[in-house]
Amino acid sequence: MGELMAFLLPLIIVLMVKHSDSRTHSLRYFRLGVSDPIHGVPEFISVGYVDSHPITTYDSVTRQKEPRAPWMAENLAPDHWERYTQLLRGWQQMFKVELKRLQRHYNHSGSHTYQRMIGCELLEDGSTTGFLQYAYDGQDFLIFNKDTLSWLAVDNVAHTIKQAWEANQHELLYQKNWLEEECIAWLKRFLEYGKDILQRTEPPLVRVNRKETFPGVTALFCKAHGFYPPEIYMTWMKNGEEIVQEIDYGDILPSGDGTYQTWASVELDPQSSNLYSCHVEHCGVHMVLQVPQESETIPLVMKAVSGSIVLVIVLAGVGVLVWRRRPREQNGAIYLPTPDR
């Protein structure tokens, strides 16, 4: 199960995290049913996450809901785990029945998957969102609209199920209430339990380097790593103007130590004298790495401007910018030259 979780977590994180400086907290539960599973894969798995942190697991092998975070085990009584274990055993059987029914409808045999994701988000401004959806073989199948109390069906098979589910008004109202009230209440509760982990801030280490991506094509890469929470905004500016259409972005991925990494790149025009700068925002702090022309020789310059950190870096020696929160009205940076490769 540990190896499977290690495989599932990065896939979920890629879907969950976007390039944004606005801090959002989320609670999500993923359930996966597999027909004819390969060796080592349970036929039913349920995992819970607060933000990107796994908090609970259940699978058809152990048949027990268990905590995945110490602060969950410390704060929830044994009867909580037993109660939800019984509920998930029911979900396990339900998924098995529904997956067989879908295979009959589609005339499928062999190994197929049925997935459910339910959860909510608490945004920085206090507003909330909620979501509930199903997928078959990794493709959207049914999506719940809590505002209209209806399901969006993607094909005729899904439409048949949609009609049956929408006939149960009590269940629709229950799902709406769970998404808008119960889920948010649980999320706030879990955020308090794990506040030392979930509400911490670790600033990114940022560096810029120049790389030949193809023969005759050179790109600037702005790379950030070691940061938490995963919400971060990165962009390139050319001559002081943002160039969104010219930028390639990497996914925000876990680094394996509880922090995250990502990058943004832009191709250089070798015939121009454009001035490029990488802008990074994380938890309200803004950094600018100004990149001089390759032919220039400029000493390292760094200064704080209106709460921002500005660093001019010569690319002949790639460097890393480390920034940390300082006492109010004090911002600073430490420049750490990287060893030669």
UniProtKB/Swiss-Prot annotation:
Sequence positions that bind 5-(2-oxopropylideneamino)-6-(D-ribitylamino)uracil: 31, 46, 65, 116, 174-175
The biological processes this protein is annotated with in GO are: antigen processing and presentation of peptide antigen via MHC class I; immune response; innate immune response
Residues engaged in binding 7-hydroxy-6-methyl-8-(1-D-ribityl)lumazine? 31, 46, 65, 116, 174-175
How does it get modified after it is made?
A: N-glycosylated.
Topology Extracellular: residue spans = 23-302
Q: Which range is the signal sequence, renumbered to this chain? A: 1-22
Membrane association type: Single-pass type I membrane protein
Q: Does the keyword Nuclease apply?
A: no
Q: Where the protein is mainly located, per its record?
A: membrane
In this chain, 2-amino-4-oxopteridine-6-carbaldehyde is annotated as bound at 65
* Stretches for region Antigen-binding cleft: 23-201
Question: Where does this protein reside within or beyond the cell?
Answer: Cell membrane; Endoplasmic reticulum membrane; Golgi apparatus membrane; Early endosome membrane
Location of the Ig-like C1-type domain: 203-299
Q: Which residues bind 5-(2-oxoethylideneamino)-6-(D-ribitylamino)uracil?
A: 31, 46, 65, 116, 174-175
Q: Where does 8-(9H-purin-6-yl)-2-oxa-8-azabicyclo[3.3.1]nona-3,6-diene-4,6-dicarbaldehyde bind?
A: 29, 31, 65, 80, 116
- SUPFAM superfamilies in the record, alphabetically? Immunoglobulin (SSF48726), MHC antigen-recognition domain (SSF54452)
Q: Which GO terms describe its cellular component?
A: early endosome membrane; endoplasmic reticulum membrane; external side of plasma membrane; extracellular space; Golgi membrane; late endosome membrane; MHC class I protein complex
Q: Which CDD domains does UniProt cross-reference here?
A: IgC1_MHC_I_alpha3
Return the similarity comment. Answer: Belongs to the MHC class I family.
The record describes its quaternary structure and partners as: Heterotrimer that consists of MR1, B2M and metabolite antigen. Major classes of metabolite ligands presented by MR1 include riboflavin-related antigens, pyrimidines and ribityl lumazines, nucleobase adducts and folate derivatives. Forms reversible covalent Schiff base complexes with microbial pyrimidine-based metabolite, which serves as a molecular switch triggering complete folding, stable association with B2M and translocation of the ternary complex from endoplasmic reticulum to the plasma membrane. Alternatively, forms non-Schiff base complexes with ribityl lumazines.
Name of the protein = Major histocompatibility complex class I-related protein 1
What organism is recorded for this protein? Pan troglodytes (Chimpanzee)
Gene for this chain: MR1
